[in-house]
């Protein structure tokens, strides 16, 4: 399908882009910005923000929307990774950091302990930085979710990704709509600020998106993002875009989500779960405690 006129990526500050790339390379860490071919990479890097990808760059799952490599990481976890991520954050002086990972079904805790270690390392090395984690589902393990929350992230995010009907088509067979809701519910019950994201343009209806938003509010999610699905390049498993959702429809989703009680909503054609993450966090704070 031909790209519509509203799908346009803005360039960022070239100097900041180079600085982020150099710091990431020097630290030997991965970013989801590069691994997932995010359309906002130059905009975000130009603003001096980045989403770090931990636990390697090989995912044990094969969702049909994601460009990250799939395979068997063979249980490897790099013990130096927390310190290296923290050093990159400190070197860049980032005020808001997003930490995400590949799925690691090969690990007993799904990688939760590494998330906790990275959060603690960043907080120790860059105490000024707010930290958002974007975790996999950890197989629905309450213990894994608790270990990450207890590390003290400022936001706990886990993406629902799509509507209930399309979940078996869009996500890996080991993923579950209800398990994702349960993960978010567990994090909220432990006192975390919670966040989730949805993609549209995969064949869902408007009412199905509203139903998914309602399901997220039922587990008291604070922040939600809604963006257009863009097919990654290079692999036949990736789903085709079924529809280009116009900007005015995203505005309707935003209005509906705000009416449901979400404290911050980021919706638009190029929105991804980590896009404008700092702004969404600040908006959530303003609505929660009047800051």
From Swiss-Prot:
Pfam families: Radical_SAM. It catalyses: [[Fe-S] cluster scaffold protein carrying a second [4Fe-4S](2+) cluster] + N(6)-octanoyl-L-lysyl-[protein] + 2 oxidized [2Fe-2S]-[ferredoxin] + 2 S-adenosyl-L-methionine + 4 H(+) = [[Fe-S] cluster scaffold protein] + N(6)-[(R)-dihydrolipoyl]-L-lysyl-[protein] + 4 Fe(3+) + 2 hydrogen sulfide + 2 5'-deoxyadenosine + 2 L-methionine + 2 reduced [2Fe-2S]-[ferredoxin]. [4Fe-4S] cluster 2 binds at residues 59, 63, 66. GO terms for molecular function: 4 iron, 4 sulfur cluster binding; lipoate synthase activity; metal ion binding. Keywords: 4Fe-4S, Cytoplasm, Iron, Iron-sulfur, Metal-binding, S-adenosyl-L-methionine, Transferase. Residues 45-263 form the Radical SAM core domain. It is found in: Cytoplasm. Its main location: cytoplasm. [4Fe-4S] cluster 1 binds at residues 33, 38, 44, 274. Its EC number is 2.8.1.8. Its cofactor is [4Fe-4S] cluster. Pathway: Protein modification; protein lipoylation via endogenous pathway; protein N(6)-(lipoyl)lysine from octanoyl-[acyl-carrier-protein]: step 2/2. One of its GO terms (cellular component) is cytoplasm. SMART domains: Elp3. Belongs to the radical SAM superfamily. Lipoyl synthase family. This is Lipoyl synthase. The gene is lipA.
């Amino acid at each position: 399908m031909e790209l519509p006129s509203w799908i346009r990526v803005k360039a960022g500050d070239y100097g900041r882009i180079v600085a982020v790339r150099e710091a990431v390379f020097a630290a030997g860490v991965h970013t989801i910005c590069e691994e997932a071919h995010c359309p906002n990479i130059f905009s975000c890097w130009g603003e001096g923000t980045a989403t770090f990808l931990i636990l390697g760059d090989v995912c044990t799952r094969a969702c049909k929307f994601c460009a990250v490599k799939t395979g068997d990481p063979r249980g490897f976890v790099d013990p130096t990774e927390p310190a290296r991520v923290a050093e990159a954050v400190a070197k860049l002086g980032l005020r808001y950091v997003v930490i995400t990972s590949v799925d690691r079904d090969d690990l007993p805790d799904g990688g939760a302990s590494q998330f906790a270690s990275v959060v603690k390392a960043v907080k120790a090395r860059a105490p000024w930085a707010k930290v958002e984690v974007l975790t996999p589902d950890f197989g629905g393990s309450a213990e894994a979710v608790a270990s990450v929350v207890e590390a003290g992230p400022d936001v706990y995010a886990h993406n629902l990704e799509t509507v209930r009907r399309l979940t078996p088509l869009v996500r890996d067979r080991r993923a579950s709509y209800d398990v994702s809701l349960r993960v978010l519910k567990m994090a909220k019950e432990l006192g975390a600020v919670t966040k989730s994201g949805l993609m549209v343009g995969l064949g869902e209806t408007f009412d199905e998106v509203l139903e998914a938003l309602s399901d997220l509010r039922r587990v008291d999610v604070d922040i939600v993002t809604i963006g257009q699905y863009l097919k990654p390049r290079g692999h036949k498993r990736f789903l085709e875009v079924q529809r280009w959702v116009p900007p005015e429809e995203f505005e309707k989703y935003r209005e509906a989500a705000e009416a449901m009680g979400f404290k911050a909503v980021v919706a638009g054609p190029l929105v991804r779960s980590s896009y404008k993450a700092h702004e969404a966090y600040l908006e959530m704070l303003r609505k929660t405690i009047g800051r």
